[in-house]
Amino acid sequence: MANKGKYYMTTAIAYTSGKPHIGNTYEIILADAIARYKRAEGYDVYFQTGTDEHGQKIQEKAEAAGISPKEFVDQISGEVKRIWDMVNSSYDNFVRTTDEDHEKCVKKIFKKLYDQGDIYKGSYEGLYCTPCESFWTESQLVDGKCPDCGREVQPAKEEAYFFKMSKYADRLIDYINTHPDFIQPVSRKNEMMNNFLLPGLQDLCVSRTSYSWGIPVDFDPKH
């Protein structure tokens, strides 16, 4: 069968604050079915999955278990990979965010964006949900609690670096409008446009100082 070209796909990478659950497994099986179908059609498929291994929640779980964060994520990531292999998923690459090559790449991209003015230092203030590792505004809360998990939130403020997403909002809106099939299904395109882009895209917090388990910023080690 003739090669129809490259086809890249990825799952969301499983967060390693706890053992994998049925939702993670459901996703890898669906993604694997798509990868196999595309290969059968003649596409050169590159199928990636993996684990997300940094964050405050993981640091706290490791401390509670009496082990280092790296030991903790090694255990969880190993269990994720064991299950992905047990269901015979045909991924081409299993990426871990603690992999040396991944960390080097993140640092290189961060520095490049900072040097070209797309990352700047500021301060983040809001209502913080530790389990979700998310900041919220008062208007986003549901009954005064985290809109994602329903738990209590706490006032928090910290110095942080931000990526200037707002700088690219008009370019994104124009591209999506001129390429109607770029985001599918249409309901997701409408969600992105109406909930994020058109109301005014906010700059993204890309560093933290309140915990240490992450990829350090080379030129500002407290982040």
Segments from the language model and where they lie:
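Short clusters of hydrophobic/aromatic residues that line enzyme substrate/ligand-binding pockets
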Residues: 58, 62, 136, 146, ...
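Short secondary-structure capping/junction motifs at helix and strand boundaries
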Residues: 88-96, 114-127, 139-140, 154-156, ...
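N-terminal Rossmann-like or analogous alpha/beta NTP/dinucleotide-binding catalytic cores
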Residues: 2-119, 133
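Generic serine detector
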Residues: 17, 68, 77, 89-90, ...
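Cys/His-rich short segments
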Residues: 116-173
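Alpha-helix boundary/capping detector
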Residues: 64, 110, 139-140, 198
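Structured secondary-structure scaffolds
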Residues: 2-49, 101-105, 149, 155-223
